Amino acid sequence: IGNGAKFSHPSPHQMTMQLTPTIAIHMSAALGALALGPIALWARKGAKQRPMIHRAAGYAWVTLMLVTAVSAMFIRDFKLPNIAGYTPIHLLVPYTLFGIFGAFLYLARKDITAHKKTMQRLYFGACVTAGAFTLLPGRLLGSLVWGQWFGVL
C-alpha cells in the first residue's frame, strides 16, 4: 500500500470471532448439502438404480438445504450492496424454498423428469454457484480459504 502500511490478514482467532453460531450452522448445513447432493443425484443414474439411497440422501439433502436457506435469513451483510442487510445472494433463499416445493409437487404429480431437472438446478444453482460466491475475497469463507489457508490474498 502506498503509505507504507502493510496489509495483514486476520488471525485465525479473529476469523473465529466472526464465525457466529448462525454462520456455523449455515456453513455446516451448506457444506453437508454440497457433499450429499451428488449421492442423491447419482443413486438414480445408470442401469442399476438405488432408490433407497436416493430417497435417504434426497431427504437429508432437502433438510440441509432448508436449514441453509432459513439460516441465511439471519445472516446479514451491510458492507456489500444490500437492502436492510440482505445482499443479492439472499435471492437464493426464495429460489431454494420454491424449488424444493416445486420438486415435491412434481413428485406428487408423478412428473419424475421435472422433479429431476428441478433438483439438478437447485443443486448446481443453490449449492455450487452459491458456494463459489462465498469464496470471493472479502467474504468470511473467502478470506479464510484464500488468506489463511493458501496465503494468496
Stretch-by-stretch model annotation:
Residues 1-153:
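Alpha-helical membrane insertion/targeting regions
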